[in-house]
Amino acid sequence: YNTNNSVNTRLFAANGGINRVFFSVGFPLTKFLSFGLTTNYNFGKFEYESFNLYEGVNYGIYSNSSSDISGFNYQFSSNIDIPIKKDLNFNIMLSYSPSSILNSVNTQDLYTSTTNLINLNSLGDLVEVNLEERGLKSTELRVPKKYIYGVGLGNHNKWYIGAQIEKKFSSNFENRFLNIKNID
């Protein structure tokens, strides 16, 4: 077993998320059937950090990658409200969100550091990675299509019990910038 250049310290961190502003409209088609549409504007930022410090090497490598995300997606829904008794209704809900594209503007910086704590005393060289050259400065994230099915039973404005199932087709999700595949 060769211990030369084996990883002594390896750290990973991530933070961020997507915010959403939405507009929804719904209207009745019949006495028991209604239809709705939601338009979402998604925006946010993700940051990913990693640090590798190797035995026998003076400087470790610190990577800071970030993605600014923005884009629209849509959801179409229908609701069937069937009266069973005077104060008892049965509901069926169907919802469909087609696949959509979110735009990602990416940056990546690499640092060398003598410790796993990044501060002015430990920093070595700084390199801003040329993502434009690799075709990764602007990438697209495909939001998978999804279906939501729900049923419920209740007394209007008093009580309600229901169940919902969501089917999301996320097996083809891919983030080329971070080389992350098949995220659910």
Residue ranges and their predicted role:
Residues 1-184:
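Outer-membrane beta-barrel porins/channels
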